[in-house]
């Protein structure tokens, strides 16, 4: 299970410090460099998406209880009658099999009846349903990254979010557990205006564009970057400057073990992944590489009941690992880096357009651009 210390979330939201409390003293076998190294936190992308229908309460619970994720990532949309719901897509086709309908064209009374295409059938949750899950006893240390999609007017969406946060009590103030992910300056400005006490993470696929936000004029802001855009010298310089400015770095969406290991070596503070269980396993292997690995947690993540169920849990994990273990061949490595090369060509071509659009304010760059680039 994930850390249950309230400091897990509070440290992130107050100082935007994402790293786990496990410290590894690395030698040459630990990925390069010496000295103490903190493992990134496991952030479950739309919940435990690798195993369950995405953005459902089942996927969120499984991410925490089965995979041991430290945090959840999900997406915000607004129904026609003003209910804040959790869905990556603005339409209902892919996840719910409904053609030619958008979320903002439907009332909640209709949306709540839909079931996912993927088994086991689940219903679309609201933001208040997720907050209810986070308010359960023992989950005080879990935090959540809310990706604000750009299909809805930001003032209306964030106003509704503010109402939900104000009307849903929790054991820890929500501004110590919630981070808003924004794709562009207009949405950052709206969060700072409507929810000024909440931290923000810039979501971007371009390190050159994101560099514009490495300024004291953008306080309380971390970076949530497309991982494959950071491979290579441009990304390395960006990571260096992020750390030099004492900002935190999250990378998305990391599902290959090689890129998980790369993210640890690069010093990422959080890793967004469809498979948080696999990432936790990679982190455990990484701990084993360290010389004199030590753990300094304020509370233990294990319990006697958890120990009694360890054998059953391990069998379940082993079954899930079937078919996803990397083959370690040079062909796989070549394929991964060729894929990165192709993506970086697209990023290089479209970044100037992105920066011009942002500069002249024609339209704020958002997730649709990332979708167009197939990132």
Roles of regions detected by a PLM:
Residues 1-375:
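Phosphate-group recognition and catalysis centered on beta-loop-alpha active-site segments
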């Amino acid at each position: 299970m994930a850390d249950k210390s309230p400091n897990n979330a509070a440290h992130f939201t107050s100082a935007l410090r994402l790293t786990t409390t496990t410290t590894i003293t690395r030698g040459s076998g630990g990925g390069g460099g010496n000295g103490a190294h903190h493992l990134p936190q496991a952030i479950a992308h739309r919940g435990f998406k690798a195993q369950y229908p995405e953005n459902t309460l089942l996927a969120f619970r499984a991410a925490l209880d089965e995979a041991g994720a430290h945090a959840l990532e999900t997406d915000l949309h607004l129904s026609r009658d003003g209910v804040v719901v959790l869905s990556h897509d603005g339409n209902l086709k892919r996840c719910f099999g409904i053609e030619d309908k958008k979320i903002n064209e439907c009332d909640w009374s209709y949306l709540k009846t839909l079931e996912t295409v993927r088994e086991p059938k689940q219903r679309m949750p609201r933001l208040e349903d997720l907050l209810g899950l986070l308010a359960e006893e023992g989950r005080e240390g879990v935090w959540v990254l809310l990706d604000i999609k750009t299909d809805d007017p930001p003032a209306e969406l964030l106003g509704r979010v503010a109402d939900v946060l104000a009307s849903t009590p929790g054991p820890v103030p929500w501004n110590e557990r919630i981070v808003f992910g924004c794709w562009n300056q207009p949405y950052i400005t709206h969060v700072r205006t409507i929810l000024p006490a909440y931290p923000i993470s810039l979501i971007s696929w371009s390190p050159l564009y994101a560099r514009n936000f490495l300024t004291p004029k953008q306080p309380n802001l971390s970076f949530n970057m497309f991982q494959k855009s950071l491979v290579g010298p441009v990304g390395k310089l960006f990571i260096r400057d992020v750390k030099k400015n004492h900002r935190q770095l999250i990378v998305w969406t990391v599902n290959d073990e090689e890129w998980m290991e790369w993210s640890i070596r690069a010093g990422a503070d959080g890793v967004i992944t469809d498979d948080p269980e696999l990432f936790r396993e990679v982190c455990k292997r990484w701990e084993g590489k360290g010389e004199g690995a030590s753990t300094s947690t304020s509370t233990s993540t294990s319990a006697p009941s958890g120990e009694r169920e360890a054998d059953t849990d391990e069998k379940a994990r082993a079954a899930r690992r079937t078919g996803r273990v990397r083959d370690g061949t040079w062909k796989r490595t070549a394929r991964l880096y060729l894929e990165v090369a192709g993506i970086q060509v697209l990023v290089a071509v479209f970044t100037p357009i992105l920066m011009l659009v942002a500069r002249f304010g024609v339209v704020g760059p958002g997730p649709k651009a990332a979708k167009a680039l197939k990132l």
